[in-house]
Regions:
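Interdomain hinge/linker segments and adjacent boundary elements that couple functional modules
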Residues: 2-38, 44-48, 54-55, 59-173, ...
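C-terminal regulatory/effector modules of DNA-binding transcriptional regulators
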Residues: 177, 181-272
């Protein structure tokens, strides 16, 4: 619930609706503001303890202003941020002006997880494979991943992701027919209203997803053989967001997609 009492109790957006300058700044702001709320502090009260104006602290808590090294240290102390967590926030603060991310294999996925956590929804587009959130464990294993590396998801309620699949993704030479049939059935029953098929004539494009974050431009995530590339600058995401709009316009309805998937599953002998 919003706090009451001062004009700066709850961080506010700029007039254009975009708060944070960069995604790193947004992650810092969200973590600090979550800690502030956990301690039941208004921004005015915290600003007083930091000897900052409420307006200045409000900009920090929305990511519109990156805290200095001294300020982030003081905020972590006052908000009782876990000491083991502080170096991560210090790094994000130091790199807050950067607008692209490359997370290489072995580097961990905590940064990606943090970005996913602040996203409200995501839209996936994949021309060749079933996106990971929709895969059965058997399908994932057939692609060469270790057993136990993936669990078949339960139907999502409420669904927050949307999926645009190219027909090419519904066949794969490495996937046995029975596994693909099970996968097709799984698509029919797992969040069926979130999946839409593209026409076969739609030009294939390397897979990606667009993360939609409140009060922030669309963020593009590309998984390139385990290396995660994250783009946030509108200049660098424009080609992907334009393609996504075109794909969304061209895609079949969810109902038509569900019928198509059911028919394909029936041809494999898995419907009964």
């Amino acid at each position: 619930m919003p706090e009451h009492g001062t004009a700066f109790d709850t961080p506010r957006a700029d007039g254009n609706g975009v708060r944070a300058k960069t995604l790193r700044g947004l992650l810092v702001a969200r973590e600090l503001d979550t800690a502030r709320l956990a301690r039941s502090l208004t921004t005015r009260e915290l600003a007083g303890q930091m000897t900052m104006s409420p307006a200045m602290l409000n900009r920090v808590m929305t990511g519109r202003r990156v805290p200095t090294a001294l300020e982030i240290g003081g905020l972590c102390g006052l908000l009782d941020i876990d000491p083991a967590r502080r170096p991560h926030l210090y790094r994000l603060t130091a790199d807050a002006d950067l607008t692209e991310w490359i997370i290489r294999p072995g580097a961990g996925t905590s940064a990606l997880g943090a970005i996913e956590e602040v996203a409200d929804t995501a839209t996936w587009l994949d021309p060749l494979l079933i996106p990971r959130p929709l895969r059965t464990a058997a399908y994932h294993h057939a692609l060469g991943h270790p057993i136990g590396d993936h669990q078949s998801p339960e139907p999502a309620a409420p669904p927050t992701d949307r999926f645009l699949l190219h027909p090419r993704a519904l066949t794969h030479p490495a996937i046995p027919a029975d596994v693909m049939g099970e996968q097709l059935l799984h698509l029919c029953h797992t969040a069926p209203n979130t999946i839409r098929l593209l026409p076969a004539t739609f030009p294939p494009h390397p897979g990606f997803r667009v993360l939609h974050i409140d009060h922030f431009p669309p963020v593009v995530h590309i998984d390139h053989h385990g290396t995660h590339v994250i783009l946030e600058s509108p200049d660098s995401t424009a080609a992907h967001t334009t393609l996504l709009r075109a794909a969304t316009t061209a895609a079949a309805t969810a109902e038509h997609t569900r019928r198509t998937l059911t028919d394909l599953a029936a041809r494999t002998g898995t419907v009964g």
